[in-house]
């Protein structure tokens, strides 16, 4: 898959950059995957970027102000990484799920 087919606002320099899949879990990253470094309430995915790269990630998407190619790894900045992950997942899978389940809660 090529970045230009899935990312609308990607620089033309990177449109032909190949990727094989996506992951937001560094331990599940495979060769040439995109790693989405998502910051959560307790765990920051940015802390696992090196692990994702050692597992084969060639592209890292992060909310940190990092952009461009560094040591063969393409870093892409996103202001809304969760939305981008959802959009790219939909484009790759090309289907709407039959069921959507949501869990909500309160603090008391």
Report each predicted region and the residues it spans:
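N-terminal leader/targeting and accessory segments in enzymes
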Residues: 1-87, 91
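Walker A (P-loop) phosphate-binding motif
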Residues: 90-108
